[in-house]
């Protein structure tokens, strides 16, 4: 199973990286967090796998809105890290 997931993780990382290099420069920067949501996504997927990584990414994207103060928000080292989502 892990051997099947590794190419998928690489593909997702590639798609996100293409977004960072091609699409992101064309639109107004609006991510309120550091690291950016796309970099957060790559780190989360590599650290926790596809499903947990995508879940953390979705939660992060929902928090990245005009009413959020933003700031530094690193991917947790432990999926059960007690953070406010």
From Swiss-Prot:
The keyword Cell membrane applies. InterPro entries: Membr_insert_effic_factor_YidD. Transmembrane segments: none annotated. It is a peripheral membrane protein. The keyword Ribonucleoprotein does not apply. Its main location: membrane. SMART domains: Haemolytic. Keywords: Cell membrane, Membrane. GO terms for cellular component: plasma membrane. It is found in: Cell membrane. PANTHER family: MEMBRANE PROTEIN INSERTION EFFICIENCY FACTOR-RELATED. Could be involved in insertion of integral membrane proteins into the membrane. HAMAP family: UPF0161_YidD. Belongs to the UPF0161 family. This is Putative membrane protein insertion efficiency factor. It comes from Baumannia cicadellinicola subsp. Homalodisca coagulata. The lineage of its organism: Bacteria, Pseudomonadati, Pseudomonadota, Gammaproteobacteria, Candidatus Palibaumannia.
